[in-house]
A protein has these predicted regions:
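An N-terminal boundary/leader segment
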Residues: 2-182, 403, 407-408, 605-611
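Acyltransferase
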Residues: 148, 155-156, 185, 393-416, ...
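N-terminal, positively charged, Ser/Thr/Ala/Gly-biased leader segments
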Residues: 169-220
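Short, well-ordered beta-strand elements within core beta-sheets of diverse protein domains
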Residues: 139-146, 225-228, 336-343, 459-464, ...
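Glycine-rich, small-residue loops and helix-cap segments
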Residues: 147, 202, 242, 246-248, ...
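Short helix-loop capping/hinge segments that flank enzyme active sites or metal/cofactor-binding pockets
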Residues: 118-131, 200-220, 378-387, 427-484, ...
């Protein structure tokens, strides 16, 4: 073989693979010219004549033995690729590898402790039942326990509000009136006998519409799937049903868990109808509007924290491996999480009591007990880290949080997370979503999407090299280890640096519709998102929570102030801070958020709703 014009078979294979990756056919080993000839003839196999002609056009030479070897190898790979793609892979089948948020340096409490709730004042039902629509789940549960109100009454009230306000808010895809009333009646019968299945027994709730409910449409927010029905419930639906909660609606998601736009329009934020945040847009909007007791959202890159920020909620993104994803649409097997979106931090703990447990289906789950009892915690003894504590440019919302925590006796400790000079880690889900939606792309289903441009990310996954993906995963592990070392010994932390109320909303399972932006400087942890306009994109929670998100850390958003009232936002828009914790420290960060809320009482503020 000539040294200048010819190449080894191994080198040619690499070049063939690189070329076919660029045209979305990375599983094959044939050059572009050869592929064109195959298309012209309709052949599924390469012939020696095809290869010989293509090599001449390409200006390279191989001897007969080398050409035949190339034909054999290419045809073998083509046959394997065709065979692999002929299989339909069910949605619930995951790759046989999982990440674990517990890396060297992470210490977790594996001792189960009794679950207990904080004390509440004596409660009495107002003259009009609808006045409790914005009450914390903690208070609603007490009304049910003391039999001052029935689950049927609460369910009817919340369903009526969902129907009344949905025309403006567009936060509901499917109303589950009949199912809800059946579950509410069953809850009342058990509560009347003194049987409380869980802290959320009898509480009406809604789930994001990427979570399957047997026999009902699960649309994923997309025109390509708007008639999709599964014959099984997601684990989280089963768990909450077993806990006696009452499912009343499938709530909107941005198309395929991105942004706030779906096939029915753009879901609205009740504080400001001109803005929104996703992709858990419906859960955020419905909870903030007092149309459900609580909701379940999902997050890959910001889709719980960002809409919680925009809608003024105490939304919890649990530790990766804490809550089952079985039955929920996948964007990233090593990123996706499900969690509660509530008005009050302790409400999140009540929901977590039911859903934070292994289910035997999602093999990424860790059997770490979720322990909640506010009486066990002392704010003075928790180690709370603050990055940028001595910054000349303090985020005013961080300052409000710090002022209250200091008032309660907390000690705030400066925390430094050193630069690691490693690449960004928030693009890894692109590979994973490309695999999950591979059949959609190959079948031409992208054309049926409400926004076909959303499918470009799925297609681009085929431009990526599997070696790069694995190397990026190793770098991700380095980042996780560095973060674990930096936060070792801390119970919680947040960022004080920055001048605003947070960042705008984000990409996949984040606020905007154009995708995520860059990660903030690695010297500080993620600054909390405020959420962006649906369809707007911007720095989102997608980019803004990158390190803690990729590391699997929990976070809870808490409202610390409201902007000045305006024409668009009659009572102002919520602003706040996200409190993060090391893996499986949900109870600690929820306790800190609850402690702030109990003083500030901002969670009792209500938006002005339109009909």
């Amino acid at each position: 073989m000539k040294t200048k014009k010819r190449m080894s078979i191994d080198e040619s294979r690499r070049r063939f693979m690189a070329y076919f990756s660029s045209v979305g056919l990375g599983a094959t080993l044939v050059p572009g010219i050869l592929w064109g000839k195959m298309q012209e003839t309709g052949s599924q196999q390469i012939t020696l004549d095809m290869l010989t002609t293509s090599l001449k056009l390409g200006g390279v030479e191989f001897n007969a033995e080398e050409r035949q070897a190339m034909v054999n190898t290419a045809n073998q790979n083509l046959t394997r690729a065709v065979a692999m793609r002929s299989f339909h892979i069910p949605n619930d089948v995951t790759p046989p590898f999982h990440i674990n948020a517990i890396v060297p340096g992470v210490i977790v409490n594996k001792t189960p402790q009794p679950f207990a709730l904080g004390k509440v004042p004596a409660l009495k039902v107002p003259g009009t039942l609808e006045d409790v629509a914005f009450w914390p789940v903690r208070h609603l549960s007490e009304l049910l326990r003391t039999k001052q109100v029935s689950s049927v009454d609460l369910t009817k009230m919340y369903l009526e509000r969902l129907h009344r306000y949905n025309g403006q808010l567009l936060n509901t895809v499917t109303f589950l009136d009949e199912l809800a009333m059946t579950q509410a009646k069953a809850a009342d019968a058990e509560i009347a006998q003194g049987k409380m299945r869980s802290p959320v027994h009898g509480i009406p709730w809604g789930c994001k519409d990427i979570i399957s409910v047997k026999g009902y449409k699960t649309t994923w927010g997309s025109g390509a799937y708007k008639d999709q029905v599964f014959d099984y419930d997601a684990s989280i639906v089963e768990q909450l049903r077993e806990g006696g909660a009452v499912l009343i609606a499938k709530l909107t998601t941005g198309e395929l868990a991105q942004g706030a736009n779906w096939f029915g329009g753009m879901t609205r934020n009740p504080w400001n109808y001109g803005s929104s945040s996703g992709s858990s847009a419906g859960p955020g909007s419905a909870t903030a509007a007092g149309c459900v007791g609580f909701a379940i959202g999902t997050e890959t890159q910001g889709s719980i924290l960002s809409p919680s920020a925009t809608n003024g909620l105490a939304g919890l993104r649990p530790t990766f491996g804490r809550v089952s994803r079985y039955g929920a649409m996948t964007l990233g097997w090593t990123y996706d999480r499900l969690g509660p979106m509530c008005r009050y931090a302790e409400d999140c703990a009540m929901v977590m009591n039911v859903i934070a447990k292994p289910d035997g289906r999602d093999m990424s789950l860790s059997d770490i007990p979720f322990n909640w009892n506010p009486a066990r915690y002392d704010i003075k003894k928790l180690k709370i880290g603050v990055t940028g504590l001595n910054s000349p440019n303090i985020n005013p919302n961080a300052q409000k949080l710090m002022d209250v925590l200091k008032q309660l006796g907390a000690t705030l400790t400066p925390l430094t997370i050193h630069p690691n000079n490693l690449p960004q880690f928030n693009e890894g889900f692109t590979y994973e979503q490309g695999a999950f939606f591979d059949e959609l792309v190959r079948s031409g289903g992208v054309a049926k999407m409400t926004n076909p441009g959303r499918g470009n990310g799925f297609k681009s996954a085929r431009l990526m090299n599997v070696v790069d993906f694995l190397q990026q995963s190793r770098l991700r592990m380095m980042m996780m280890t560095n973060l674990a070392k930096a936060t070792a010994g801390f119970d919680a932390y947040f960022s004080a640096a920055g001048g605003g109320g947070g960042q705008r909303g984000a990409g996949a399972r984040g606020a905007g519709a154009r995708g995520a932006t860059a990660e903030p400087p690695p010297t500080v942890p993620d600054t909390p998102p405020r959420g962006g306009r649906g369809g707007g994109g911007g720095g989102a929670a997608g980019g803004g929570t990158g390190n803690t998100n990729s590391a699997g850390y929990p976070g809870v958003h808490v409202v610390t102030s409201f902007s000045e009232p305006s024409t668009e936002a009659p009572v102002g828009s919520p602003q706040g801070i996200t409190i993060y914790g090391p893996p499986f420290k949900e109870s600690e960060i929820l306790f800190i958020a609850k402690s702030f809320q109990d003083v500030a009482q901002l969670h009792t503020k209500k938006p002005v709703l339109k009909t």
